[in-house]
Amino acid sequence: NTSLTRDTLIHSLNLVAPKAIIVGEELLPGYSTVRERVAIDATRNWFVADKDTSRQPGIAPDGFINLMSASLDESSDNPRSSRQVFFDDPCFYIYTSGTTGLPKAGVFKHGRWMRSSASFGMIALDMGPDDIVYCTLPLYHATGLCVCWGSAISGAAGFAIRRKFSASQFWNDVRHYRATTIGYVGELCRYLVDQPPSADDSRHGVTKMIGNGLRPGAWSAFKTRFAVNHICELYAASDGNIGFTNILNFDNTIGFSLMSWELVAYDHDSGAPIRDAKGLMRKVTKGEKGLLLAKIDDKAPLDGYTDPQKTAKVVLHDVFEKGDRYFNTGDLLRNIGFGHAQFVDRLGDTYRWKGENVSTTEVENILLRHPQICEAVAYGVEIHNTNGRAGMAAITPAESLATLDFSELLAFAKQQMPLYAVPLFLRVKVKMETTGTFKYQKTRLKTEA
């Protein structure tokens, strides 16, 4: 995630023990501040200039090797090591905030990469060489990397990217690149719908779009105004073993999954699945929201995280019968029948804002490092006519409200965490209510918010 800085960046880099790093010029300042705390050999720090390096490779700063210049005399053939790559080998890591704490590195294997890119690109979208995908989503996200880019690769299609999403320039870019397919997240669609209407709204070649998080309220408005025939809404846990795809082009659904899954009853305060007197879980009825569990078997293996203990925490045993295993997605879905489902919400200590997953534990830990804060509880709150949840932090001052410098606190937060994780709202409390087991009553705070 290119927004990560300082301690979070150090943690994420060291988590996978990298042998080398490639740093883009635009991110050089962020990496330079943490370089001494990352165990990468000085001869393996590669630099790429922020320009058309095929014409002008640029000049690497001291301590870096210019990757483009150093590559000029190398063979254009695939390296010998590529002959020994197998389905079960790790392809890359997708970093996720999971449900608590610092980012975890989810292992994405070559076999899963090929399955996911083929299912989205060939089965769901029927991509071909005449197609062009326009993607404004970051490629460190599974939607941008696996869904959009993977679909383009599967269909031998074109792939047009933009460094940062622009609502005002979106359709101009689509026309310029002659795009037939767009990748999205729900927030992106809302920004486009909020733009002033134009006579050119439907003047483009886009016939299909793929992504996640498009809310029912914006679904029909987007489809009608921009004349996009096929909305391929999907659900996939980048650190899990299941995915849903709206292949049949129904409205307001994430579609169906070929994997085995169930929705179970859960505790509304803790978010944990509920077990009956026999120790087994209860499936919810059609139309009722429930916690999504995905069966782990030979058909749907769980690659997990780099840390086996982190993986063990998301695996549930003896769910419906002795010996079965399920992946706990931490997400709430609703079964709408015919094998189709709707996404409802996220559980746990994570909420989604500006297309990013925000870990409340991480926000709390950073705020608690401020000398003027005694207690901090972070959570996501709903705002009318927006996607996801905005951050709110309830705090108790270390001394008094009069001594709390709000401007300095905001500057501190912006320096220590990504901008999307900085809480939009601050609630100051004299004392934080706790449960009988001394846990903060986050559910009550959310309700009051």
Regions found by a protein language model. Give the residues of each.
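Conserved structural elements of the adenylate-forming
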Residues: L72-E74, N78, F87, G106-G128, ...
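ATP-dependent adenylate-forming carboxylate-activation enzymes
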Residues: N1-H11, E25-Y31, A157-H176, V358-V363
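Conserved AMP-binding/adenylation subdomain of ANL enzymes
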Residues: M114-I132, Y140-T180
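Conserved pre-ATP/AMP-binding loop-to-beta segment of ANL
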Residues: F47, G63, L72-Y95, L102, ...
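Gly/Ser/Thr-rich phosphate-binding loop
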Residues: S154, H176-V185, V193-H268, P301-Y305
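ATP phosphate-binding P-loop of adenylate-forming
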Residues: D88-G101, G106, S117, G121, ...
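Structural core segment of the AMP-binding/adenylate-forming
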Residues: N1-A70, Q415
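AMP-binding/adenylate-forming catalytic core of the ANL superfamily
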Residues: L4, I10-H11, K19-V23, A236, ...
